[in-house]
Amino acid sequence: MKMPKNAPPRTKKHSNGTQNGPLNQNLPSLLIGTGEHKELVMQMPLSTRDGNGRHGLKLAEPVQRGLSPWLNPTQLNRPTFLMNFPFSYATGSPNNPWMKDLPDQKRAPDFKRAAVQFLQVYQNISAEGLVYLLPTPRDGDLQDLLYTANLGIVLEHLPDKNTVVISNFKSPPRRGETPLGVKFFQDMGYNVHVAPAKFEGEAELKHLYDNIYVGGYGIRSEIETYEWMEQTFDMRIIKVQEVEKYLYHLDCSIFPITKENTLVGTELFTKKEVRELAKFTNIIPVSVDECFSGICNSVRLPNQVLNSSHIHDLKAGTQDYQYEITKNRKLEDICSNLAMEVAYFNLSEFHKSGALLSCMVMHLNRHCYKIALTA
């Protein structure tokens, strides 16, 4: 296009209309946030023809922030979860007995297969609610970041639905996840706390109902964490000691399937601990073998329980096949009695790091448990 003879020379301007200089203080702007996290948002000039006047571009009117009834995902009236795509997944630092039992060549993951297996779980959960994906930093050595159940716990019983406790990892390869989790939830506007003693997330602390939780300690988490939580957040935590080194997180041996019923590997705890837990929930006993096969490593959706099963990779008639089919039938019977179905996912690539399905999912709320089903 030919420039008019009397037109002024073109100069490069910032989006706020200033020419290579500081922000124009006369332009409308918004301040978002509080304290040191305030963010300045400038209004952009209109670029449409109708916005051009004889004195130059007309500025857009200041716009108020949307008055959403929700401040964060936890407050949504639908199931909400946090997952992480396995961009940084690796098995180079064996940090649990399952990994140490595997030779290096059998522990190496098939990344394409891992991606397919992850997406099958993700697609199923996202069909029932909102799934946030935790970003993976490019320069981080975070082999277990995809196991978001260990990142922390959102405290369901607090009325503001805005408080999260981030993990203080015992496992050295996972300690870099703590600052990442703090930043993620701070950016989302949560009140963020870091556990003062060792603690590895909701995989170790299961919500039952109201302010009642059950917490596991002794291998990856410390009892001092739960004492601090009780004093700080008005919680009642039934504390149970974990002693089986292969079942090193509580989600391996306890699974609240409804607000009233909880699967418990009763042989893994003392009689006193089981009696105390029975005061608060109806215990559905499961065997040690069923725990080893992952019956408690499940995730509850509104009318469905998700569980990992690689039974089609196993040879019929073998001991491993028998363990797996026994676990599956037990879970199906339990779910049938509670008017729920079971959905199975082959997560064999994640077995290489000692993980099952519940490890991959962090609850941002417990809306699924508000739905009562009747058989």
Regions found by a protein language model. Give the residues of each.
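The feature marks the mature, well-folded catalytic cores of soluble enzymes
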Residues: 2-4, 10, 17, 21-375
